[in-house]
Amino acid sequence: MKTLKVGLCGAGNVGRAVLRTLIQSSQLLEVQGGVHFDIVQVGARRGKEVVPYEGINITTNLEDVATNPDVDVLVEVIGGVNFAYELVTTALKEGKHVVTANKALIASHGNELFTLAKENNVDIGFEASVAGGTPVIKALREGLVATKVKWFAGILNGTSNFILTEMESNQSTFESALKKAQELGLAESDPSLDINGTDAAQKASILAALAFHVPFDFSLVSFEGIEEIELEDLGYAKELGYSIKHIAHGELENNVVCVSAYPTLVDNETLLSQVGKEMNALEIFSEGIGSTVYYGPGAGPEPTASAVIADLVDIAKGGWDLDINSDDQNKLEVLDRKRAARYYRLQVNDEPGVIAKISSLFGDQNISIEALIQHEAKSKENLESISVVIISGEISNNEAVKLKNALEDLPEVFSGVKKFRIHAGEK
């Protein structure tokens, strides 16, 4: 039986879950994985206080683990970027494999880390960096290796999905839904990276590198968060047959790759629209197969630990020969020419001719109107206004922004115009 000597850096919730699983499920891992794991050393800044197991070599100096000659593979679950980068590069230069759950690290430094790993004939496992315990990276690395991926779309941040589910299902305000997520441990005390779209965008960057064989380049990922979504938008979307989800999306067309993470209207007949609470899901569309969907818990100590240990088993069995940037024909670009239908919500004066004027503006810009609904104002402050919601035809990002600005310039329109993408689905 293969023995793998493990050094663990990080003893927070995820680190302790990894350690607990390796110890308590050792027999199961030997039977099902064919691997015996020897925990050589654990790096924890608070030492024995957070590692309640006897007989384990614990150090408060995490660099010791990265340089320990008895360690075969370093597991990095400390989070952050700078110090994690130092630890991982040290371990790779020492000829050690690395397993990480750190999406920010991979999205920011993936190119140089994989180059360094290749130079030292070692592997990097990063399944836990995207979608927690749902094996989406393994699907791209192995299950879909014989197909050409055309696009992917998914819900990759459990915090934002929980908030939107609460708002839609219980008519909760954004603030109360966020507070509930924090009370349940589904959101950090500072949830900014989750709600402003950064977390999902980092994950989308990683998936794009695997799906389309382009370099990691987080700077070319376009993204927005969910802060601007209001209960009105969720209600109007439902009336039109949609749900609003925060969708990470990547697409390859004519050798150009565009990657994004945006609030998006999703047809209620699709599987992604049914993904609720803190769950994650990813739909991958590839030639010859069509759509495959992966669903499961996207975060939490146990799902993340499961993904980490799956990578450890794969490394013990020989790892992967992974060349991320293997297709020089494909080019990653900022999302500007990707065409999609758009949702616009305007608050306008309740007077004759307003709808005709808005329709004329769409016509002037050669943009079709696919659907239009209007309602009386929902607040006492705006009794002399009406809400108008318009679904446009497919337009580029530049056209969508230009149209939004033109609508806001109309004297009959007041307050900001809301604009969201619409996911087209299979094609």
Residue ranges and their predicted role:
Residues 57, 149-153, 161-164, 168, ...:
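Catalytic, metal-anchored helix/loop core of enzyme active sites in primary metabolism
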Residues 84-90, 103-141:
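Rossmann-fold NAD(P)-binding glycine/threonine-rich loop
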